[in-house]
Structure formats: C-alpha cells, structure tokens
C-alpha cells in the first residue's frame, strides 16, 4: 500500500477473529488518526440500537389472568416466567410475526426447546430454562413472536383496542436486538513511514440468531444509507421544480429512496445506476435478477412496493430520462 500525505487512507477489508460461536472481534485498519473513534462509536451505537431481530411480545398461559396470578405446581412466579421468556433467542426465515405454542406436563424443567415451532421459526438457545414444574401439572401457553429493533416497552405497543383485549393476554417489554454486547478499542497502526494511524478493534457478542460479521455489515449498511442523503443536496433541492415542466408523472422522478426498500435492495439498485422510480420500472425481472446480490426475496419486495403505487416492472417510457434529469442520478 503506497501512502502519500495528501490522500485519505481507505482501510483494508475487515479481519474477523471468532472467539466463540456468538462472539468475534472485527479489525479494520489502517485508518486516519481520529477515524477509529469516529467509526467505532457510530458502529457501536447502530449495533446496539438498530439491528432488527425477533422477540416474544405477548403470552397467554392457561389459567393465568394477570402477571400476579399464582399457578399451583409452578416453582417460579409468573413474572419470573415472563422475564425468562424475554431471553429466548428466535430466528424467523420469513415474515414479521408468528404465533407459537408450548405444552409441558410436569414434573420437570421447561426449556425453550419445548416451544413448538414450524419450518419458518428456529429457537437458537433451546437449553434456556423458562420455568420448573414441581407437580404433575400441565403448562400450556401461546406465544406471539414479532420483528422489531431496539428495545420496546409493552406500553409503547398498546393498541387502540386495549380496553377490549383478551383477558389473560400478557404483554412483554421486548428487546429485539440480536446484539448482546459491543465494545471497541482504538490501537496504533503503521503503514510504511506513517506511524500516526488508527486500528479499530470491535468486540461483538450476539444471541446466536445472527453472526458478528453479518451484524457489523448490517450496521455499516444502515450508516451508509443514512449518510448518503448528504451527497444528495442538489437532487433534493431541485427535485420539486423540474417535474411539472417535463410532462412526466412526478412519481417517476422521485428517488428510489422514497420506496423505503431495505438497505440491501436500495444499494443493489444504486450500484446499477438505478436512481429514480422511472429508471426502475423500465427494468424487467430478468434484468434485475442479474444484479449482483439482488435475489428473489429483494425482487418480490420491489414488485410489491411498486404495485402499491400502481406501477410494475417492464413498463416502457418514452423520452426517458426527460430534460433536466442526468443519467448519474442527479437532477441537472
């Protein structure tokens, strides 16, 4: 790597050191002085608050009307059972919610492995203890699983129909984040004669539903998507003034960011110079599937979002791009 004093270094690809199944160190170097703390702090915040995951949000237990009900044959209080359910690590392969059940005949230990799942749901920590049955008692419960990010108290998810909700439906405070712990350190790095560089070391532990490398990659995608708007000032400033004069439906001149696609789908499209909705609808399904890293799941997402706006792939537009719209994704 040749380095000059008047250019900002671009770090090499991350180095991954796996410490356990759920813990790893990610090393990024070399970085300009100060960039280690800048990137480390930003990634740590996003990793802890914004990585999506799944959690149990509602529980119904036969014979239990509220959190303070006493259940004969159950060693723990109902409150302790609910706390233990919050630590069940769940992975869903598709969809945003599911309802599962658990049935256990005592005496014995009830673990996460006793939760009945289907092909779409996977319990990662099956040995996690939920409660203990001390007598020949049956425990039956229904669990609602939902997708989210960060921490959401039960009160924040209360719906307008709260007054008429089913008696015995217990709502849980939910921690959706699959990231359990993140710490970072900045060490000294050297390239050739430069000794004033940073090395960023991120130590990350997850609950097993996502590996550390994928979590860091997702956090980087989120940061990249948020920062991308700062390179789009001209686009947004002029975007409202051009459509009426062009004779083109204003919707087609909106940036693909307005479709609120996932970060991965949006980045794949931009990498192929697809910046406007008008660019996108002229592409066919076959063409999009040839896009690197854009699979059938992303294609389905794109088709559904377009359909909500009365649009579809494979449409033909005359005189596209209209005057004032540049090919590189900026309004001219």
UniProtKB/Swiss-Prot annotation:
CDD domains: RNAP_alpha_NTD. Signal peptide: none annotated. The keyword Transmembrane helix does not apply. It comes from the Bacteria. Pfam families: RNA_pol_A_bac, RNA_pol_A_CTD, RNA_pol_L. Coiled coil: none annotated. Homodimer. The RNAP catalytic core consists of 2 alpha, 1 beta, 1 beta' and 1 omega subunit. When a sigma factor is associated with the core the holoenzyme is formed, which can initiate transcription. Belongs to the RNA polymerase alpha chain family. The N-terminal domain is essential for RNAP assembly and basal transcription, whereas the C-terminal domain is involved in interaction with transcriptional regulators and with upstream promoter elements. DNA-dependent RNA polymerase catalyzes the transcription of DNA into RNA using the four ribonucleoside triphosphates as substrates. This is DNA-directed RNA polymerase subunit alpha.
């Amino acid at each position: 790597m040749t380095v000059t004093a008047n250019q900002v270094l671009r770090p090499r690809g991350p180095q991954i050191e796996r410490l356990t199944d759920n813990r790893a160190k990610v090393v990024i170097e070399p970085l300009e002085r100060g960039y280690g703390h800048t990137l480390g702090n930003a990634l740590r915040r996003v990793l802890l608050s914004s990585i999506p995951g799944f959690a149990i949000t509602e529980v119904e237990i036969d014979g239990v009307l509220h959190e303070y009900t006493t259940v004969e044959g159950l060693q723990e209080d109902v409150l302790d059972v609910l706390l233990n359910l919050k630590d069940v690590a769940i992975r869903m392969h598709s969809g945003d919610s599911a309802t599962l059940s658990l049935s256990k005949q005592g005496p014995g230990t009830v673990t996460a492995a006793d939760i009945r799942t289907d092909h779409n749901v996977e319990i990662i920590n099956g040995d996690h203890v939920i409660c203990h049955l001390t007598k020949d008692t049956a425990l039956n419960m229904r669990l609602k699983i939902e997708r989210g990010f960060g921490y959401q108290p039960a009160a924040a998810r209360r719906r307008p129909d709260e007054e008429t909700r089913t008696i015995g439906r217990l709502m849980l405070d939910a921690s959706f984040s699959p990231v359990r712990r993140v710490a970072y350190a900045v060490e000294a790095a050297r390239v050739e004669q430069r000794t004033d560089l940073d090395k960023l070391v991120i130590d990350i532990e997850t609950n097993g539903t996502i590996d550390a490398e994928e979590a860091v990659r997702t956090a980087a995608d989120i940061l990249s998507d948020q920062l991308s708007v700062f390179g789009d000032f001209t686009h947004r400033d002029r975007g409202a003034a051009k459509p009426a004069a062009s004779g083109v439906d204003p919707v087609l001149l909106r940036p693909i960011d307005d479709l609120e696609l996932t970060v991965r789908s949006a980045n794949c499209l931009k990498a192929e110079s697809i910046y406007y909705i008008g660019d996108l609808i002229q592409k066919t399904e076959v063409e999009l599937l040839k896009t690197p890293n854009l699979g059938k799941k992303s294609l389905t997402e794109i088709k559904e979002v377009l359909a909500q706006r009365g649009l579809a792939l494979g449409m033909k537009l005359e005189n596209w791009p209209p005057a004032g719209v540049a090919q590189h994704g900026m309004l001219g």
